[in-house]
Amino acid sequence: MKMKKMVAGLSTAVFAFSALAACGGGTDNESTTDNNASSDNKPEKIVIWEDIEKSETTKEVAKKFEEENGVKVEVVEVQMTDQKDKLALDGPAGKGPDIILVPHDQIGTIADQGHLAPLSDESVLDTFTDAAKSAVMFDGQAYGYPKSVETPVLMFNKDLVSEAPKTMDELYKLSNDVKADGQYGFLALWDNFYFAHGVIAGFGGYVFKEDGGALDPSDIGLNNEGAVEGFEYIGKWYQEGLFPKGLVGESGGQAMDQLFTEKKAHTVMNGPWAVAGYTDAGVNLGAAPMPTLPNGEPIKTFMGVKTYALSAYTENQEWAEKFLQELTNEENALAMFEAYNEIPPVSALESNETITSNEVAKAVFDQATNAIPMPNIPEMGQVWEPMAQALQLVATGKQDAQKSADDAVKVIEQQIQANNQ
């Protein structure tokens, strides 16, 4: 396996909402799409796997596409988390789709396994944000059309907090001020690396070193001086009793949500996927970008991008790409946002009133400028568990930050080496 893979760089990132959602695309793709597919190779139909309960807009675009081009588009609902494994079985058997939907951080693994085809023309991605474009790059090639983005933001109860704090020092003071009343000023799942990454990166840590747009999995920065400082900062919130003891492990998310919906927590760090549950529970919800760290740096959250990718087994790539250019253009991306609150990484929509008037969507767009696409190279799979274990040791006070970070990196390096043999 190559030691350097093309991947999303640090780039202004994310516009998050509901754990994954949105859609992106071009504003005017007619001239491009007309050249991409010819009538000589027109198929009877193409098949796209869409996420469950989020296919109505796709079906509407498919109907219009068939009317205009004479190519039927069959839209099949398949749970997004199941599509990767299902393609591995159905694709080689000739029963798979032309297009699948996957989280961008799975692109490297699926492409390495031979199940994805790169785009024939990367220039069609120019209408997407830089962060979204970088997220779908792997090994020097583009592997999909960004549909939607997500990243954690600061959510607050407007009945308890009139205005979102701008700094973590403000949140630290608030947390201490309300502690005696059994309240929590701020809660976050910082024993989970997905959320903790923002702090660690903000202090100077990094997962894999970026080199000319490529990530080098042989250079891991999760135990450098900045990363250890991030570990120590995270541990401080637990050790000073500003986070409850139950905010560790698998039940941490449930505990945090309960405290927030019961008005015992003033603010939380969470993503768009949490919005429906909070509002249904009656929370007067506000949202803002994450506050800056004590060092003055932003919290550099992870960004995720739902991506429409092409099956390596398709015989209709030209027409599949033509459909995706239509599905992810500005008009249809906005329609998906209005239907499903999925935030589209389309540059032209950043100032669209429909999106800017939505407080959570705007917070995600703003946070995006400091977000980092999750590495999509296969080696990232070896990072999550060792980092979770290290963070939990720090959170529970069982081990200091330096040793926890060193041990985690050692395990990650060993696992990557073992998988590359």
Where on the chain are the PLM-derived regions?
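Extracytoplasmic "Venus flytrap"/periplasmic binding protein-like
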Residues: 64-130, 137, 143, 158-162, ...
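A structural signal for short loop-to-beta-strand junctions that line the ligand-binding cleft
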Residues: 90, 97-98, 125-159, 184-188, ...
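Hinge/lid segment of periplasmic solute-binding proteins
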Residues: 104-153, 163-174, 180-182, 226, ...
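Long, aromatic- and glycine/proline-rich binding clefts that accommodate carbohydrate-like moieties
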Residues: 135-136, 288, 337-386, 393, ...
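Glycine-centered hinge/linker elements that transmit conformational signals in sensory
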Residues: 175, 217-247
